[in-house]
UniProtKB/Swiss-Prot annotation:
Organism: Carboxydothermus hydrogenoformans (strain ATCC BAA-161 / DSM 6008 / Z-2901)
GO MF annotation list: translation elongation factor activity
PANTHER family the record matches: ELONGATION FACTOR TS, ELONGATION FACTOR TS, MITOCHONDRIAL
CDD domains recorded: UBA_EF-Ts
Role of this protein: Associates with the EF-Tu.GDP complex and induces the exchange of GDP to GTP. It remains bound to the aminoacyl-tRNA.EF-Tu.GTP complex up to the GTP hydrolysis stage on the ribosome.
Lineage top rank: taxon: Bacteria
The name this protein goes by in its record: Elongation factor Ts
Main subcellular localisation: cytoplasm
InterPro entries: EF-Ts_dimer_sf (IPR036402), Transl_elong_EFTs/EF1B (IPR001816), Transl_elong_EFTs/EF1B_dimer (IPR014039), Transl_elong_Ts_CS (IPR018101), UBA-like_sf (IPR009060)
Length: 217
C-alpha cells in the first residue's frame, strides 16, 4: 500500500510532483529506490523534449573567490523571467559559476572545441603513445581513449560535478531541466585568475573553491 508519507518522502528526495511520485511508487510496488530511478528516467525523457525550446531569459551569474583572486561570469538561459528569479535557478547558476572557478573548464561542450585544438591534442597523444613503445595497431585506440579524458577535463558539461562527483555537470543540467520544467542552456562563460600567465608563486586557488563548494553542500 502506498501511503501519503511515502509520497511525501519521495517528493522531498526528488522534487517531482505529488501525482508523479504516487504513480512512480505504484509502478515500483512501493520500492523507494526503484521509484526514484523511474522518476529519473522519466525526467531525462522530459528534459530531452524540452532541449530544443528557445531559452532567452536567465541570468549572468558572477562569482568572485578569495578576495578577488578568481573571477567568473557565466550566462545561463531559461525560457521565462519567472524561472530566472526562482531560488532553484539562482542556486543552480551559483553552483555552475563555482564549478567553473574550481575546475577550470575551457569550453561549455565538446562541440565548442575548435577542430585544430582537437587535432593538435590528438598529435600530442599519438606521440606520447608511440614514445611509450606501444604497438601501432593499439596506438589509435589509446589516442581516442585519452582524447575522451581530455574532453572531460576541458568541457564544462562533461566534468564531474564538484558537489557530487558521481554525476557530471550535464547530468545536473538535465535534472534541473526535468525538475524546473523549462529548457535551460549554459551559453557561455569567462574565467579569470589573478596573475594567470605570469611568473608567480604557485597557489592552488581552484582547490580552495572546490573545498568551499564541498563544505557548502
Amino acid at each position: 500500500m502506498i501511503t501519503s508519507q511515502m509520497v511525501k518522502e519521495l517528493r522531498e528526495r526528488t522534487g517531482a510532483g505529488m501525482m508523479d511520485c504516487k504513480r512512480a511508487l505504484e509502478e515500483a510496488n512501493g520500492d523507494m529506490e526503484k521509484a526514484i530511478e523511474i522518476l529519473r528516467q522519466k525526467g531525462l525523457a522530459a528534459a530531452a523534449k524540452k532541449a530544443g525550446r528557445i531559452a532567452t531569459e536567465g541570468v549572468v551569474e558572477a562569482y568572485i573567490h578569495g578576495g578577488g583572486r578568481i573571477g567568473v561570469l557565466v550566462e545561463i538561459n531559461c525560457e521565462t523571467d519567472f524561472v530566472a528569479k526562482t531560488d532553484e535557478f539562482k542556486s543552480f547558476a551559483r553552483d555552475i559559476a563555482m564549478q567553473i572557478a574550481a575546475a577550470k573548464p575551457e569550453y561549455v561542450r565538446r562541440e565548442d572545441v575548435p577542430q585544430e585544438v582537437i587535432e593538435k591534442e590528438r598529435e600530442i597523444l599519438r606521440a606520447q603513445a608511440l614514445n611509450e613503445g606501444k604497438p601501432a595497431n593499439v596506438v589509435e585506440k589509446m589516442v581516442e581513449g585519452r582524447l575522451e579524458k581530455f574532453f572531460k577535463e576541458v568541457c564544462l558539461l562533461e566534468q564531474p560535478f564538484i558537489k557530487n562527483p558521481d554525476i557530471t555537470v550535464k547530468d545536473l543540467l538535465t535534472e534541473k531541466i526535468a525538475k524546473i520544467g523549462e529548457n535551460i542552456n549554459i551559453r557561455r562563460f569567462v574565467r579569470f585568475e589573478l596573475g594567470e600567465g605570469l611568473a608567480k608563486k604557485e597557489e592552488d586557488f581552484a582547490a580552495e573553491v572546490a573545498a568551499a563548494m564541498k563544505v557548502n553542500k
